Amino acid sequence: ELVGTGVALGLLPGGTGNLLARNLGGVVDSLEEAATIAFTGQDRRIDVGWLVIDPTQEQRSGLPRAAPNVHCFTVMAGLGFDAQMMADAPEGVKDKVGWAAYVASGGKHLNDAPFSLELTVDGRPVLRRKTRTVVVGNCGELTGGMVLLPDASIDDGRLDVATVSPESLTQWIGVAARVLANRDDGPALERESGRDITVSVHPPQLCEVDGDVLAEATNLRFVVQPRALAVRVVR
């Protein structure tokens, strides 16, 4: 609701707020310090992303208007393995062990079947293949401190997208090693960036925004709204 208003968002420790604060160099472990920043810090304008699930013809261009199938995100959105991992992490376990809960839930889906993907960036078809997950990020550092999208910047007017397509446990390990070592793309990890990203998948895949699991979808549109949100950060 603060997008486009100029009213600043204050970040308090917990959930997606932690991820956003971490990407902004903020406080993630002290409620008192975070509250002080929220009241006395300076404003920084950041981009926001919009996810449109199964867009209508009108929703295929321009910034989307408020609608039941339109969702805002500040950190990331994803589908496939990414969303299944979020969906299967029990709330009680997340409260106790944090991001490690996603590791446990992710293990259940390592052998899920891949899905067919067509990826278009700024009107340009860039990828058509079988894949396991798609992550679209407004910033680079994700859960557990992993930098999946090293070129992402929260105020560059672009979204970054990663497709992860391992065909075996060995390739899963290879993807993890590549991400942790901040290495270039490989056969099971491909990254792009743009302002307007469309994804078509078959069969339909579960999707999420900022860790909130939504519905299954076949066609998804991700679009950036540059510098649309003011966030209170350290002076």
Pin down the residues of each PLM region.
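Glycine-rich phosphate/pyrophosphate-binding beta-alpha loops
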Residues: 78, 82, 135-150, 213
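ATP/nucleoside-binding phosphotransfer catalytic cores, i.e., glycine-rich phosphate-binding loops
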Residues: 121-128, 153-156, 163-235
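Short acidic/glycine-rich loop or secondary-structure boundary segments that cap or lie
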Residues: 82-85, 127-129, 142-145, 169-173
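Short Gly/aromatic-enriched secondary-structure transition segments
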Residues: 89, 149-152
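Catalytic core of DAGKc-family lipid kinases
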Residues: 3-132
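Short, conserved beta-strand edge motifs with alternating hydrophobic and charged residues
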Residues: 118, 129-130, 135-137, 160-164
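Short beta-strand-to-turn element immediately C-terminal to the catalytic PLP-Schiff-base lysine
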Residues: 51-53, 88, 136-137, 162-164, ...
